Amino acid sequence: MIFMSFQPFTTASQSFAPVQETVEGGVYLRLSEQGVILGNGYFSRTYQTMGGRLSAGGILNRRVDGAAAEYLPGEASQEFILRFVSGRKRAALSAGDLTIDSLSYADVSGGKALCISFQPSAVLGLPVTVRLVAVLKEQDHFLREYIEVSVPEQQADSLTLDSIDLLSFHVQQGQKTWSRPEMEPANISGFHMGLGQPVYLGSLFLGCEFPAADTRIEEHTARTRYYSGKSFSHLKKTDGVFLSWPAVLGAARSDDREVLQSDFFCYIETVSTKTEFRKQYNSWYDHMLDITSENIVGSFYEIEKGLTQHGVAPMDAYVVDDGWNDYSKGFWCFNEKFPQELYPSAALAKKFASHFGLWLGPRGGYTMDTPRFAKHIQKAGNGFRNPKSKDICVAAPVYQQGVKKLFLDFMQRFDLNYWKLDGFALRPCPKKRHGHMTGGEHDMYFTTELWENWTDIFTEMRRQREEQGKSLWINFTCYVNPSPWFLQWVNSIWMQNSGDHSFQIPSKGGSKQDSDVDRMMTYRDDRYFDFVYTRELQFPLAHLYNHDPIYGNTVKSPRTKQTIQATTEEFRNYLYQLAARGTSFWELYFSFHMLDEEKWEICAEVLRWAEAHFHILRNAKLIGKTPAGGDVYGYSAWDGAEGIVSLRNPANFQQEYEITLNRLIGVKEDAADMGCTQVLPYAAKPDGKAYRYGDGVKLTLAPHEVRILRFGAPDRQAARLHVAKAAAGNAVSLCFDKRVSTEGARVLLNGVQAKLTLCADYHTVIAACQEAFKPYEAVQIEAALTDCAGNAVKETAQVVYYPDDLIFRADARPGAVLAERGIEGEGDFTLAFPLSTEDADAVLLAQDGAFTAAVDVDGTLRFTVGSVCVASTKPVNDGKRRSVTALREKNGMLKLYLDGALDASAYCAEAINEALPAGEVRAEKLPGGTVRLINRALAFDEIAK
């Protein structure tokens, strides 16, 4: 086993000392008449050792409101139960059956470890030695327990480990508990769907760090069960002993389930793979299986253009989905549509200052070719066919080693930073000759080995990227139990209980005339309710992959039978509703031609807003009732005294809803003096009230309305004018760094009040006057308006109207001044010139303090704007004539085009759109040709012309 967060250690590897007296500290060990107490400032455990036998003592939780809460396991409780098989014989060995040999402790990083060693005990004629290790750290509100088991090496073949129960606590009558319910199948069986969940006992949570452990309350006993089915000769060992997966016991602030869940999720975040906000494009709903190397490149270019020209930071990845594999071959390989494999797509993503991602379906995809592909793989000796599910047996070691080799190879060759691993074991495979485990209750021998091997593969994938100083996002999709403990290896997991997309009409207040995106939201959010409230799966929504947003040409409307359509407002509601769910992972399933200017503006604004508020949104909780019944529902997310609450009315009639600002929806008890701004529908100023913990908020929602409220300290910083430019012969564009309002606004152009239009992003104002501007003359701007926080905004600016955005066009000669005034400010621009030189270490063009274009000592072309620099991928000082286009985009990215083709890009998040001072533009050593400076960033298709 390879652990991502906590690595159990053998007792032989640490310096353990006898526990002979009380040991104080941030983590303490105290001897009592009953035994030994292990504790810290959050909680403590008593291990009863009376009579030389171990029994489960009380647990004291100091985190609860008021007095500390004590949990007392029932008399039948056991710290562990081991079950063995030898031939047809079975035996069980409980902690209480063993005689304690010694108590010892060791100092470990940040805490202490307690070891309880037992005298060897005969099991089915073989001596078995067990040690219990409990590890507690000073800063943790949870401890871990695991056991160390050994048998004589020469007899290891004779004894099989069936299963282990850890923290087997008998639940006494009247104790408040929660355990996962019996649930319906979601492609995989209901039993397997429920694996890897915690149990709640009073104000405690209990679980196992193996994501396929069977943890639940059964017959009045809470326990976490690990299945094996392997003989001790085949179990993985460390220093000759078998180490179990750790069980976890944690303390929460309350026995209320919502609070328990929040505190459990806090623990999960400590063991999870680092996961931040992520945005990327995926080809699936644009082309589905009809992707080619050419149309992928075309879509990448168009999506990047739409996002970049609206100020969105570079995507975290551009992803090729299914359609690249040749399903007629004996293993994963490229079909004839990808003659250069993925090199063109991967290279283009890099040229966007982005990364590349890829889909692979371990089971063989989801097409009519899947069963045949499994047969081809078996015939080629690269794996086997699972007869139960008629797909690839994903547990066969030969196949696992083959795909691991492919993963590592593809990451090396194509620099992949994202994998969409789509489809694992739909049904447990019964064929032992495939080289994997079979049998056990609910086929759990198969399931345990399956996920132990796959998590080892994920570890190897991450290790390769980490050694290269690079990141990796693993998206774990279909036929996976959504256990939060998988997050030790993966970043996101598909919700399992949903289709990729669908359309649903509420049973109350719904109509066949409901919009496409309304029906899509109702469907997906109903699946969220099924996930959270029906199945009661304890999984943080920030890590839940939900296949949204979808706005692609392959999705057909049930109303029109044509490609789905959304109005500007419907599209805005759709994206904000997705943001409110708290997902960290935005995979844009878009077709670029379906997004008009307003939709691009909205997409850019929502992505910026969601990322800026992700520290809040990542804590989202569902509130209300499922939209399937037409009821108001939403999401509530809080980080300290900052909160975002969304509500949606899925019905076609008006409805009322009241929110109570308490900890059940995530509000901290000390929250006070909070202001409230309405994000959606956009309200230009706060409501002027002060809110505190426990307050109620009554709302009336119009039919199909999405309402989003943001709570927190009042924002006193007024919006700032970010970029001002002439947008036409009689209009200027004013872009602010926050939302603004044009209501009552006063914007003067050369002293005359302008007609104002607020753009769909709510950040940009178009101010137009009746008289045309004079070419190449300054336009004086005076603006007085309010921002979304109600702050008064007063700005003055001066812009020059350049017909066709051309600042100048001039013939270059060495040392010549091409223009007295070039570019200035934080905006985008383009510099274009021809180049034919053999010089090195030579400045070609420059505007002091703003930009330089130069040939470096190695012959590469370098374009520097402020403190950001982009270099060509190859030398340009070979004397050949070529055209150069260098530009800064609206999102601050620098790009270099050579002969009309994108060659390289650079982006620095710490130096976005640095303000550039005005100044003269000079040709230094540029030998000649016509130079153009343009007051906007040209798009790739304009440059190619």
State what each model feature region is.
Residues 40-41, 238-240, 453-686, 696-708:
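Active-site-proximal substrate-binding groove within the catalytic cores of carbohydrate-active enzymes
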